[in-house]
């Protein structure tokens, strides 16, 4: 099982770069197992083995710490659905800051790219959240709208 170093109830969802590596946390309450696969510090991990297993808490959050992980590393989750007949397969991190689709790993099985939370500049310093009653909330999965199929990372500007 992956280390629980730097993991707590307040660990952010998604991948977060911290000193010495990165934390990974995902909500999958019905999963029977969640594994972290990817390329970290030049080493490829592509197995559903005990040493790649994330730890599940009582609320359905799976988490682990990958030592040596850093900016630019690629990752994705392998999720085993609920037993006894659950589906299984690779899943992207819904909190990923960047995705890359390649010939060998096309969308939707593409890799997420580990990026620091401050890697994208925001130009909205004067923004103020409107009253909730004035909001229209939409959820869009950016990877669904990707126009890059040549192995180049997609980003939010691709859907603008």
Language-model features, listed with the residues they occupy:
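The feature marks proteins involved in alpha-glucan
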Residues: 1-19, 23, 44-49, 53-139, ...
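Residue-level detector of conserved, well-ordered beta-strand and adjacent loop positions
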Residues: 27, 37, 55
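Short proline/glycine-enriched turn/loop motifs at strand-loop junctions of beta-rich domains
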Residues: 27-34, 70
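Beta-strand signatures of extracellular beta-sandwich domains
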Residues: 33-37, 76
């Amino acid at each position: 099982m992956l280390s629980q170093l730097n993991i707590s109830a307040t660990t952010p969802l998604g991948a977060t770069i911290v000193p010495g590596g990165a934390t990974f946390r995902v909500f999958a309450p019905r999963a029977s197992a969640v594994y972290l696969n990817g390329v970290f510090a030049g080493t490829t991990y592509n197995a559903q083995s005990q040493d790649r297993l994330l730890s599940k808490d009582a609320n359905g959050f799976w988490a682990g710490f990958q030592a040596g992980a850093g900016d630019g590393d690629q990752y994705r989750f392998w999720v085993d659905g609920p037993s006894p007949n659950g589906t299984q397969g690779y899943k992207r991190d819904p909190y990923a800051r960047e995705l890359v689709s390649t010939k060998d790993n096309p969308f939707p099985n593409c890799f997420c790219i580990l990026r620091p939370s401050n890697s994208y500049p925001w130009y909205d310093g004067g923004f103020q959240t409107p009253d909730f009653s004035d909001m229209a909330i939409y959820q869009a999965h950016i990877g669904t709208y990707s126009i890059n199929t040549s192995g180049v990372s997609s980003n939010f500007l691709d859907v603008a």
